[in-house]
């Protein structure tokens, strides 16, 4: 699976225990996402576009409206990309 460098960095943070938090406006539309590392730092590479690509490929998912976490498919994509480098 082809995964861009930005997506790999976001997946790497999620694999280490990070989370993606979503922010919505008063109409319920997604306006901003924030990728937070386990230490509490915010990753600037995680844009709305990168988030949508990861979600579309089912590399991340949310359970019961919680923060987005990496899925098994995301872990496989992360491990598979490290073998090719």
From Swiss-Prot:
Disulfide bond annotation, renumbered to this chain: none
A Pfam family per the record: YjhX_toxin
InterPro entries xrefs: YjhX_toxin
Family, similarity comment: Belongs to the UPF0386 family.
Name of the protein in its database record: UPF0386 protein MXAN_1729
Annotated organism of origin: Myxococcus xanthus (strain DK1622)
């Amino acid at each position: 699976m082809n995964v861009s460098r930005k997506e790999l960095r976001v997946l790497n943070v999620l694999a280490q225990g990070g989370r993606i938090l979503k922010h919505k406006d008063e109409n319920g539309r997604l306006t901003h996402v924030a990728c937070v590392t386990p230490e509490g730092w915010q990753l600037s590479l995680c844009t709305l576009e990168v988030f949508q690509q990861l979600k579309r490929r089912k590399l991340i998912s949310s359970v019961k409206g919680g923060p987005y976490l990496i899925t098994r498919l995301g872990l496989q994509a992360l491990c598979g990309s490290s073998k090719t480098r």
